[in-house]
């Protein structure tokens, strides 16, 4: 946790995930009304990837924006943190 991606010469994979903006305040299903529309989100996503490539000085792997993707994750680190908010957001 004390080293940056650049110090470790690691790689970066950027995947869009609108579900991070889910609201569970009301009803039985999450609402995604706060997620940005495609015409706003896609340029932001591409801009972030470009900035990351410039900062790292190498290509950044990326997912297909808006696609249904299967992603496998292997955490290699000392901790995993789950934060449970009392506001249910």
Where do the model's predicted regions map?
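Compact, glycine-rich, soluble single-domain proteins
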Residues: 1-9, 22-34, 38-51, 55
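Glycine/charge-rich, flexible interdomain linkers and switch-proximal surface loops
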Residues: 1-12, 61-74
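Structural motif
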Residues: 11-14, 80
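Short, well-ordered secondary-structure micro-motifs
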Residues: 25-28, 73, 81
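Basic, gly/Ser/Thr/Pro-rich low-complexity segments located predominantly at protein N termini
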Residues: 32, 68-71, 82
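Nucleotide and nucleotide-moiety/phosphate-recognizing core
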Residues: 58
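Short, low-complexity, polybasic intrinsically disordered segments
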Residues: 76-89
């Amino acid at each position: 946790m004390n080293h940056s991606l650049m110090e470790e010469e690691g790689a970066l994979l950027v995947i869009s995930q609108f579900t991070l903006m889910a609201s569970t305040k009301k009803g039985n299903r999450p609402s995604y009304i706060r997620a940005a529309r495609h015409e706003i989100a896609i340029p932001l996503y591409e801009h972030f990837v470009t900035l990351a490539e410039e900062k790292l000085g190498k290509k950044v792997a990326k997912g297909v924006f808006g696609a249904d993707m299967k992603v496998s994750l292997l955490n290699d680190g000392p901790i995993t943190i789950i934060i449970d908010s009392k506001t249910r957001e």
